[in-house]
Amino acid sequence: MLKFIQNNREITALLAVVLLFVLPGFLDRQYLSVQTLTMVYSSAQILILLAMGATLVMLTRNIDVSVGSITGMCAVLLGMLLNAGYSLPVACVTTLLLGLLAGFFNGVLVAWLKIPAIVATLGTLGLYRGIMLLWTGGKWIEGLPAELKQLSAPLLFGVSAIGWLTIILVAFMAWLLAKTAFGRSFYATGDNLQGARQLGVRTEAIRIVAFSLNGCMAALAGIVFASQIGFIPNQTGTGLEMKAIAACVLGGISLLGGSGAIIGAVLGAWFLTQIDSVLVLLRIPAWWNDFIAGLVLLAVLVFDGRLRCALERNLRRQKYARFMTPPPSVKPASSGKKREAA
């Protein structure tokens, strides 16, 4: 049972999402509706995109804490370009290129300059946040064109154009990691770096690609953010990096690298977003959101750690069982010997 849970973390994450959807339905029947699902999905799109990017980085046994700042910086660039009169396609492509460049810079620091990922991305977190504030002067960007907001307007089955794009990206990333040699290279790099090199995997290039795609996903999340709310505050993206990492951990992405799946990260992002909707249903103040999300994350980490220790004990027991000599069995004295002694 323990091995099944460890090897199928996506199933346990799915069960958690289903339970969190069904149980509040006993309090309010209207909660069990397609409208609720589309509402939660719309709110979860930003975190889903960030979780997909974070998955690539975490699979290579790295971590990126600058994605929130990249999201904010890219959202600001999008708003500035649109207000300067550039067309929406040009502004979006430029924004994605900026995110790709920011992620590439993170990858160079980690893969080529050998700076620990947490240290490098802590530095770029401040750098990108500073660039964002320098561009805006600490002010909000408002007056965005209506065509940007149309990207998040319901298009088909209550899902927006960006929502359908997110679904396509999830399916593509899941296929890429599971079915292609390129995708398996991310797992090999995080599981055994030296072994991957001996197999011919270009581990430095894989890590740079992981950080670059992570930055691109953060830029796309910035576009989604701007299209959903219609303006860009000066604190856009703050704290999103921690939520993205939490979503990945909840979905079974290992902090030690080399294991996990995109679907698990998506379910983790959905679960964290759904917590917010349940708190609204229960009329719990919004400032409890981070506390409860953190509590859930800690519980999952403790459970994951205990599960890992239990599995390691079982593996050791199975490995050394054949070397352990059974205790000598004591045979009862025969009845004949008992009579002779008498």
UniProtKB/Swiss-Prot annotation:
It is found in: Cell inner membrane. Residues 35-38, 91-92, 136-154, 234-251, 305-342 are cytoplasmic. InterPro entries: ABC_transp_permease. It is a multi-pass membrane protein. Residues 1-13, 60-69, 114, 176-212, 273-283 are periplasmic. One of its GO terms (cellular component) is plasma membrane. GO terms for molecular function: transmembrane transporter activity. The chain crosses the membrane at residues 14-34, 39-59, 70-90, 93-113, 115-135, 155-175, 213-233, 252-272, 284-304. Keywords: Cell inner membrane, Cell membrane, Membrane, Transmembrane, Transmembrane helix, Transport. Belongs to the binding-protein-dependent transport system permease family. AraH/RbsC subfamily. The complex is composed of two ATP-binding proteins (LsrA), two transmembrane proteins (LsrC and LsrD) and a solute-binding protein (LsrB). Part of the ABC transporter complex LsrABCD involved in autoinducer 2 (AI-2) import. Probably responsible for the translocation of the substrate across the membrane. This is Autoinducer 2 import system permease protein LsrC. It comes from Escherichia coli O9:H4 (strain HS).
